Design a protein with these regions (language model features):
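Aromatic "clamp/platform" in nucleotide-sugar-dependent glycosyltransferases that forms part
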Residues: 242
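Conserved donor-binding/catalytic core segment of Leloir-type glycosyltransferases
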Residues: 150-167, 173-176, 188-190
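Nucleotide-activated donor-binding/catalytic signature segment of Leloir-type glycosyltransferases, i.e.
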Residues: 200-225
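A charged, aromatic-enriched C-terminal amphipathic alpha-helix characteristic of glycosyltransferases
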Residues: 30, 298-302, 312-343
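Short hydrophobic beta-strand element within catalytic cores of glycosyltransferases
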Residues: 259-262, 276-277
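Extended catalytic core of nucleotide-activated donor transferases of GT-like folds
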Residues: 44-129, 226
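N-terminal pre-catalytic "stem/leader" segment of glycosyltransferase-like enzymes
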Residues: 1-69
Length: 425
């Protein structure tokens, strides 16, 4: 089987550098991986990054990236999301009922838009965007396997906030204290976003490190494996979010068979929440946040009721969610979701649009001279230092390096002096 299909993906450099720190980075990494494993009628797809060889390119990030306080563009003027000849797709996420006004012209200038759920698709259509928009439901990794809850000596709630006020850790804590304050048989862990890894601590030790009564807090950044362990060591996920671009956290909980209490509306997999959908209404966010339009506001009394009901009917909750866990995974594993999206794309545009361009000529690398002190490493592994000041980098990151003030373009004479030049020509 040969690589006879091609699909190009592109995003901002900070998304590529972040790897799995937050939603866009995690999604970009997984989409690239699983697009590379797509096969259509014995033709294997090759996922490439920002390549003019591909007739189609998806830019996976906010269409326009602005500082919301000053409304200044955070991308350099020469940054390009697509090549002119390409079929252009925006892959982006929305958490409210309206698209930012400064996104609209950009969204109307591409051929397709992919969003993570029907809620976001409706938001695009209700904002005056006329570009065809499709739902690209994301997926879950193989590591999120079922484990029946209710095996411990107490009931343990979990809330994961990723350092985002819209996930409403404040509402969860208020409800927990009202229902279970000082109850030795029930506890809760808040997994907050952190900036440091502490691998010497187990999940249980991290809980005790920041405990206050029956409330535990984790601030450290955890690996994927550690996050799975965290979910396994807790019984019920609480997630009264005001909106999600897709919603990885509740879906991961559901795939492990974890009873999950969450808001709906934004949620493509709401049917798997059973009777644990928090009642809600649309309204203005109660926190500052990256929103335009209205968001999903959880009803506090409904949250109280569902948390109490989950404890009162704990065994039934554990049985119900564990029984459906394999169905959740089978529908939402990453490869299935990516295969479906690419198959649907081929039906819309034709298989020829995923064939490499026959007259493609590779763009030569950009040669830069490092003028700083010490050393500097780029995201794709190129290292500059006092002994190797001149080297080549990918064209797509050269402009961002030139903006640092530490680099300038190499002259023809300088390029000719380095060994890599001769293999290049």
């Amino acid at each position: 089987m040969t690589s006879e299909l091609i699909f190009s993906l592109h995003t901002d450099q900070h998304i590529k550098d972040a790897v799995n720190i937050f939603g866009y980075a995690y999604g970009y990494n997984r989409i690239t991986k699983h697009f590379n494993e797509f096969v259509y009628r014995n033709l294997k797809l090759r996922a490439v990054q920002n390549s003019p060889e591909a007739p189609i390119q998806m830019f996976y990030m906010e269409p326009e990236w602005y500082n919301q306080s000053t409304m200044t563009n955070l991308r350099s003027p020469d940054f390009k999301k697509f090549y002119d000849h390409q079929y252009k797709i925006y892959g982006t996420h929305l958490e409210a009922t309206k698209v930012w006004p400064h996104w609209i012209d950009s969204m109307n200038a591409v051929d397709e838009i992919w969003v993570g759920n029907q809620f976001a698709k409706d938001s695009v259509l209700n904002s005056g965007v006329t570009t065809p928009t499709f739902v690209f439901e994301h997926g879950i990794d193989d590591m999120w396997k079922p484990k029946r809850r209710g095996q411990g000596d107490k009931i343990r709630f979990l809330h994961v906030d990723s350092d985002s006020p819209r996930k409403r850790a404040d509402l969860v804590e208020k409800a927990f204290l009202e229902l279970f304050k000082n109850n030795p048989n029930v506890e809760i862990t808040f997994k907050h976003h952190g900036s440091e890894r502490t691998p010497v601590f187990s999940i249980d030790q991290l809980n005790r490190r920041y405990s206050d009564g029956n409330i535990n807090r984790i601030y450290e950044t955890l690996s994927q494996d550690e996050m799975v362990e965290l979910f396994y060591s807790h019984d019920i996920l609480i997630y009264p979010s005001e909106g999600e671009g897709f919603g990885f956290i509740p879906l991961q909980a559901l795939a492990t068979g974890m009873p999950t209490i969450s808001t709906g509306r934004w949620c493509s997999y709401e049917n798997y929440l059973g009777g644990n959908v928090i009642e809600s209404k649309l309204g203005k966010t109660e926190h500052t946040g990256y929103h335009y339009g209205e968001v999903v506001l959880a009803d506090y009394d409904s949250l109280l009721h569902l948390m109490k009901n989950a404890v009162d009917n704990f065994e039934k909750q554990c049985d119900y969610f564990y029984a459906q866990a394999n169905d959740v995974y089978n529908k939402y594993n990453w490869q299935n979701r990516c295969d479906q999206m690419l198959t649907d794309l081929i039906k819309r545009v034709g298989i020829k649009m995923l064939k490499p361009l026959p007259d493609f000529k590779p763009i030569p690398p950009a040669y830069l001279v490092y003028e700083g002190n010490g050393s500097y490493s780029t995201s794709d592994g190129v290292r500059f230092d006092k002994d190797k000041r001149i080297s080549s980098v990918k064209e797509e990151i050269s402009s961002s390096l030139l903006m640092t003030g530490l680099f300038r373009k190499a002259t023809v004479e300088e390029i000719k002096k380095i060994d890599t030049y001769y293999s290049y020509i």
